[in-house]
C-alpha cells in the first residue's frame, strides 16, 4: 500500500561503479506523473490514487476517458494506473498534483511490473526448458517432442496444469526487489539495476518493494534453538 510511478521502458545500457565494475541497468522514463482521481473509503470503499503518464492528443481519446480527464482538469495521458495507499496520504494529494521522483531514493528497492515480450506459439523446450531427446542412435522423429503427457485408460485424461506447448510471453510480470542505482530528476529517469519485462517503449509500473518491508530472519533464532537441543541431550 504505497504510492508509485508509471512510465515507459527506454532501454538497457550499462554503468560503471567507482571500483570500475560494469553493471547492466534499465532506464525508465517516469516523468510527468499526475494524479487524475482520489478514491476514498466513503465514495469507493477503499483508498487509492489514480495516476496517469504521458500525453495523448484529444482526437485520440475516447469520450469516456476524455470526460474523466476533463473532470480532473488534467491533460489526457497514455497510461492510467491505480495505487492502493493508506488513507492518511489522501489528504496530501488532489487531482492535478504532479508526483515527482523524490518519492524514491538511490539504493531503494522497488518492484517493477511490465508486459513480457510475446514469442508466439512455442514448444515445450523453449516454453518450459525441457531437455531435447537424442539427436541420433535410434531416434529419428522425436527430437523436440515433449514426450508422454499422461497415462493409459486409467485415468484416461491429461491432468490440469500439464506443461505443454502453447503461447509464450505477452503477459504481465513483476520483478521484485530491484535496486535503484541512480535518479535523474531533471529528465525524469530512473536507473534500475538488472532487466525488467517488456520491450523498448513498453509500459511499466514502479512501486516500493513489498519484500523489503517484510521482517527477515537472520538465523539467530534457529541457531539458538539448535544449541538448546544439543545441550538438552543426555550424556553418554
From Swiss-Prot:
The keyword Ribonucleoprotein applies. Disulfide bonds: none annotated. The keyword Ribonucleoprotein applies. HAMAP family: Ribosomal_uL3_B (MF_01325_B). Belongs to the universal ribosomal protein uL3 family. Part of the 50S ribosomal subunit. Forms a cluster with proteins L14 and L19. GO terms for molecular function: rRNA binding; structural constituent of ribosome. The lineage of its organism: Bacteria, Pseudomonadati, Pseudomonadota, Betaproteobacteria, Nitrosomonadales. One of its GO terms (biological process) is translation. SUPFAM superfamilies: Translation proteins (SSF50447). Residues 217-228 have a biased composition (Low complexity). GO terms for cellular component: cytosolic large ribosomal subunit. This is Large ribosomal subunit protein uL3. Methylated by PrmB. Keywords: Methylation, Ribonucleoprotein, Ribosomal protein, RNA-binding, rRNA-binding. It comes from Nitrosospira multiformis (strain ATCC 25196 / NCIMB 11849 / C 71). Residues 133-145, 206-216 have a biased composition (Polar residues). One of the primary rRNA binding proteins, it binds directly near the 3'-end of the 23S rRNA, where it nucleates assembly of the 50S subunit. It holds the Pfam family Ribosomal_L3. The modification N5-methylglutamine is found at residue 153. InterPro entries: Ribosomal_uL3, Ribosomal_uL3_bac/org-type, Ribosomal_uL3_CS, Transl_B-barrel_sf. Residues 132-153, 200-236 are annotated as: Disordered.
